[in-house]
Amino acid sequence: MGRTRTKKTKQVKPTTAPSSTSSAPEPSIEALFDKAQELLIQCNYDLAHRFVQRILERDSTNAEAREMSAVIDLERGEVENARQIFLSLVPPSSTAPNPPPHSAYLYLAQLSDGPHEALGHYKAAVDLVVNRVNTGATMSEDDKSELKKTAAKALVAMIEIWMSDLCMEPEAESQCDSLLALAHSTDAGNAEVLQAEASIRMSQSRPEDAQRSVSAAWTTWRDLPPGDPKIPDGETRLQLAKLMLELGLNADALEIIAGVVSEDDQDVEAWYLEGWCLWGMAERVKAGEKLEGGNDEKGKEKQEASDDDLGWEELARDARDCLETCKMLHIGQEHADKPMLVHVEELLAQLDTLGIKPSSEQGDENDGEEWVDDEDDVEMS
């Protein structure tokens, strides 16, 4: 009988309680804020809120954290909670910092129940921003530029209120003109301000002045390379394209819309405007009209090429392709703008009446045709 092997027991090292000096340090408020901001960008609102709450547990007066908490509430649909937090950040609240954040006023303007209340909040924001620019001796030029853009955007929002909700007020026109002058002096050459100017001039039945403003707005970013931060966002560019369509500058509008589509091919409104623009061009070419391409040399050259290259049927077919894409995306995304879908279907019905088929169907028909070789054709003749 062999020797039995003794079982070896594994030695277990005694555990000692970690000393207080080896525990991980508490993250700084700045680190917590950066993490909350990162989560907010990722749309992880619940986790972002937890990080903000950790900041407020350590510093309940932290204005940035309170504002971010309100922004998170907005994203989660808790609008009234957000409103109350924003109100706590501005006078006459006893918990408002000095000076209050201009961004809180901008949010309150968008959450306002009436136009006059919104105007008051926008004005407060503009006053704060302009004061910061004028007194910020040590502020960098980039920071000043961003603040000027913020003030100009708020002034444009005020102009839009006077042109829509308060358009029947006797002082509406004078208010628009004074706000426009202030916007120009605050941020000269701002594209959105120039677009607002074009809208005002159109409402005043001054189309030539409106066209000059539209051209000036486009000039501010037209030749910039794609992705340049100075190029306005897609929504602003589509607003400019709409103004161009109202002025009959379809070719220029088409160039702007195509740029937006190339950046975001899921943008329902961009496809709608591109289809509508092309359909308008098709109608005018069919009627024997020359299309307007702007007053500069680029516009004239581009328009001459467009007139030579495309007949009305080709333009109409391109319009149909865009409108079909718009309809598909509108339904797929459950887009909120129902009148847009109604108009798209009306335009498609008109194209049906004219016998304009989508490019895919037209291509299928061409594939079924019998091709005749040029040499055979010559021999037969």
Across the structure, where does each feature detected by a protein language model lie?
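Structured C-terminal portions of repeat-based eukaryotic scaffold domains
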Residues: 208-358
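Flexible helix-coil transition and linker loops at the boundaries of alpha-helical arrays
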Residues: 20-22, 59, 88-101, 128-151, ...
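Alpha-helical segment of the N-proximal tetratricopeptide repeat
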Residues: 27-54, 75, 156-168, 246
